[in-house]
Amino acid sequence: MSILTMIKNIKQVHNKDIVFVKLGKFYYCYGKDSYIISFFFEYKLNLIENSIYSCGFPSQSLNKILAKLENKKINYVIVDRRNNYEIENKEDFKKLNSYDKYYEKAKEEVGIKLRIQKINAYLLENTDKSNIKKLILNIEGLLQKYKF
């Protein structure tokens, strides 16, 4: 069974919890969860399938991340792929859980950053096109107009 299938199954039960998957010396989260983690820690999001993103971090960062989530009262569960995705650790703030609140904030900010990355990638991939200078001048003009 693929990791995304397992995550979807886990999220059916823990839909308002950040699910961390331990893979060796790294932890990964997927979908909405990755937006929240990227929002707080500026970890890079990786597109893994259609519009599903993931992000990962080394195990030595786990305590810092969990402390932040606990401070913000965001539920989480940690599962280990090697142990058939059994829950190793979890925190449940019950009605105080602020997962949705921070997901909405993260979705907006991270969504904007992803759009900027796509624009940047397009520009870099098309530096050899004849109209790229005109496009860049137009972008610079817009930035100047709005005083950015």
Report residues per predicted region.
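Basic, polar low-complexity surface loops/patches
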Residues: M1-F148
